[in-house]
Amino acid sequence: LDFSEPGILGVYVDEQQVALREATLSQAGLKLGRELASSFSSLRPNDLIWNYVVNNYLKGQSPPAFDLLYWNADSTNLPGPMFVQYLRRLYLDNALAKNELESLDVRLDLKKINLPSYVLAAREDHIVPWKSAYASAHCIKTASRKPAGLRFVLAASGHIAGVINPAHKNKRSFWTAA
């Protein structure tokens, strides 16, 4: 919701990059899911690219069967016009957090969303930095802090593993806001 601090992903989202995407995708076309996946992998090249180059290509080893690898490879194509609007309005303009985004001529005001909210972030997330998720949690109004209001949980691990791995003693953990 709040893209004021995009983290390392910001290397791909600046005025020049967005203008290039607008020139090629704003009227039609697709942003290919495999291109997005490659972009996300390039943000953590040692873990998500070079590890496989060395082990698979150079050493001839087959990658182990690993559910996270399958999930990571399951990408989705995005409509070009939606993708460039997302980059421009949400990332560059941060319009949603500023209550400046409109849909069907209606201004979206996050403070009018008065529902219990559970916000999960992952400490090593390279796509959604946990500090951005924390800032996003405070863009919405909550009826009360407890018992139903806002619950922010910071999980150990990264973008995918931080979501699906359960907490485990001496291996994975999580923290909650008091």
Task: Give the ranges of each region predicted by the language model.
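Alpha/beta-hydrolase-fold enzymes
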Residues: 1-86
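Short, well-ordered loop/turn and helix-capping segments at boundaries between secondary-structure elements
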Residues: 92, 126, 139-142
